[in-house]
Design a protein with these regions (language model features):
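...captures the hydrophobic TM-helix bundle architecture rather than a specific catalytic motif
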Residues: 1-571, 575-623
């Protein structure tokens, strides 16, 4: 029975690959493929669920495919099935089927018709990988696919300014959550000394002994998991990204931010509940986060002027209550609540255009202005203050910008001297010297070895920060990113005798190929358009869709999406950072936090936004 679990991944994967066979004009075939794939998945899950119930609800766990294995670490795909998986899988299949049926007509004659359905199928693949995942590595694969499809769907109207800006804002916070999940996985490797599966979390004796032995490490792991879950589910104080993420088509907003993806933070807490529920501190923290979110989001939702923002904050408030329910151990109630909220928000978003049209028409015949009186009471002043604060969304967006991103931008601006030609040559030479030092590592004194690995890791971090703040030359920014990743790998290799050439090759091979493809695309743009600066959005996807596609693939390979060996390389790289190496961990984590934002920013600035050549109709900047 458990051997059937991988087929729930194969079905959407095959559907996504088949979508490339059609061009944008084949609307009937494209939508038919999507409906057929999701419909087949829904029927398969339903039949499997009946058989699973007849077998008296066995918990299924299967180790499917081993990516990498040596004496100390094993990286493998694992799939897991229980009642939580069943609820999320059925919910996802039903809602995705409804949305693709609706989108068949809603997206009719849209310029990106094929692109929309291909992205939806990729999203559905990532969603299924996440909910069927049996360990953190498998979950992280689905988590990454969801983050990338989020960026693509928000920026679906890629010739407009606001969708691109909001896509970058959303993916920035998503990346912060990804790094938190990565750090939880890193510490989990060091405390369990194996690739722990979710099935093993059900063994109370093993988990209790593990917590007693590694209490401080467990605090770190669960804190990272809570932050990752809070970001994915837009909980306080990370709530501001969700309404901004609804810049894409209404149908993608319904499935992504109204019903499925936004609830995966709840899924993560449920899946790891057996690991953290015995520590009361975490239950209290989750309850406080959920309660604060429910209160603040409710106040914000009641005063917003746009229907999508109202629905977004209403959903955030309900998910806050789900966090409380999960922390209290009321999982059945939380799952019922989750399904009700998902169906309601999907319905609200899908009918919102027609409802708004009716209300706009109706107000001409039945408009009654509200009468305001003069009130000077203390209660009215408090009410007005809360109203004003809620209109500003409690300054959550501004606070996130000031706390998370402005310090990194400021530091990057102070490092602009690293972008001179002389500096690039010096860093390239130092990198070659470091490679030579790695080759003759046995002859290097241990004291110098410890200094060099920290120095190289710090240089890698500074280079990627400089690229992140670059506003002048896209090619130089790309070169800085390439150098930063090479320094990152070398920093780990210099310290660890067991980090060999083969392990370096896993990460370097994917990055090197992506670097060459990206460099070629930027060079072709510069040759045709004379300059590739980052001071504005150029919208070159209108003229060079092929280059835009290949450059996007290069960006995805750079950030380690699972279609390249870089994904395995990142896992191996982090596994060789020891628990006591706090400085090295900090430099590496910041590097991986910023690199995705930096490469996607280059992609967005060069290829997305308003086309610089006004030889055809273009959208207003405010659209």
């Amino acid at each position: 029975m458990k051997e059937l679990l991988p087929y729930f991944i194969y079905i959407p994967l095959i559907g996504f690959l088949l979508s490339f066979l059609f061009n944008n004009k084949n609307e009937k075939q494209i939508s038919g493929l999507a409906i057929g794939v999701v419909g087949l998945q829904a029927i398969s899950i339903f039949v499997f669920a009946i058989y699973w119930v007849m077998q008296k609800f066995p918990v299924l766990d299967v180790k499917h495919f081993v990516f990498y294995k040596d004496v100390e670490i094993e990286i493998f795909l694992s799939f897991y099935f229980d009642a939580i998986t069943l609820v999320f899988a059925l919910l996802g299949a039903i809602l995705t089927l409804l949305v693709v049926l609706f989108s068949k007509y809603y997206m009719h004659r849209e310029e990106g018709y094929k692109r929309f359905f291909s992205t939806i199928l990729l999203f559905y693949l990532g969603y299924n990988i996440t909910v069927f995942s049996g360990n953190f590595e498998t979950l992280f694969i689905g988590w990454e696919f969801l983050g990338m499809t989020s960026f693509l769907l928000i920026a679906f109207y890629r010739d407009r300014y606001l969708p691109i800006k909001n896509a970058l804002k959303t993916v920035s916070l998503y990346r912060f959550g990804d790094v938190c999940l990565m750090l939880a996985l890193w510490m989990s490797h060091h405390t369990w000394h194996q690739n722990i599966t979710f099935m093993q979390f059900n063994n109370t004796d093993i988990v209790s002994a593990h917590i007693a032995e590694h209490y401080t490490d467990v605090l770190f792991i669960v804190t990272m998991l809570i932050v990752a879950a809070a970001i994915k589910s837009a909980q306080f104080p990370f709530s501001s990204w969700l309404p901004r993420a609804m810049e894409g088509p209404t149908t993608s907003s319904a499935i992504f931010y109204g019903s499925l993806s936004v609830h995966l933070g709840v899924f993560l807490l449920m899946r790891t509940y057996a690991y953290w529920h015995s520590i009361p501190l975490f239950s209290i923290i989750i309850i406080m986060v959920g309660a604060a979110t429910a209160i603040v989001a409710t106040l914000i939702a009641r005063v917003q002027s746009t229907v999508k923002t109202q629905i977004a904050y209403s959903s955030i408030a309900q998910i806050g209550l789900m966090f409380i329910e999960v922390a209290m151990g009321w999982h059945v109630f939380a799952l019922i609540h989750l399904c009700g909220n998902a169906f309601l928000r999907t319905y609200q978003l899908l009918v919102s255009p027609s409802v708004l049209g009716y209300l706009i028409h109706d107000q001409f015949f039945s408009y009654h202005p509200k009468q305001y009186g003069t009130q000077n009471s203390f209660a009215s002043k408090v009410t007005n203050s809360i109203y004003l604060l809620s209109i500003k969304e409690w300054n959550l967006n501004t606070t996130m910008k000031k706390v998370l991103w402005n310090p990194l931008k400021w530091l990057g601006k102070q490092l602009q001297f690293l972008q001179t030609n002389i500096a690039l040559i010096i860093f390239a030479v130092v990198l070659l010297m470091g490679a030579v030092a790695f080759y003759f590592e046995n002859n290097i004194p241990p004291q110098l070895d410890h200094v060099l690995h920290l120095l190289f890791s710090c240089i890698g971090m500074l280079l990627v920060l400089s690229a992140f703040a670059n506003r002048k030359n896209a090619i130089k920014a790309w070169l800085l990113i390439i150098l930063s990743q090479m320094y990152n790998v070398l920093a780990i290799a210099l310290l660890n005798d067991d980090y060999g050439f083969a392990e370096m090759l896993y990460y370097s091979a994917g990055v090197f190929l992506a670097a060459l493809i990206g460099l070629y695309c930027l060079w072709q743009i510069k040759k045709s358009e004379s300059h590739v600066s980052l001071d504005r959005f150029y919208g070159y996807v209108y003229e060079y869709p092929g280059l835009a596609f290949w450059f996007l693939l290069a960006c995805l390979a750079f950030i380690g999406l699972p279609f390249t060996p870089s994904f395995i390389g990142i896992d191996l790289l982090f596994s060789h950072i020891h628990k006591h190496e706090y400085a090295l961990l900090t430099f590496t984590a910041i590097n991986f936090l910023v690199v995705e934002i930096a490469v996607l920013r280059i992609y967005a600035r060069i290829f997305l936004g308003q086309h610089i050549k006004q030889t055809h109709p273009i959208a207003y900047k405010s659209s």
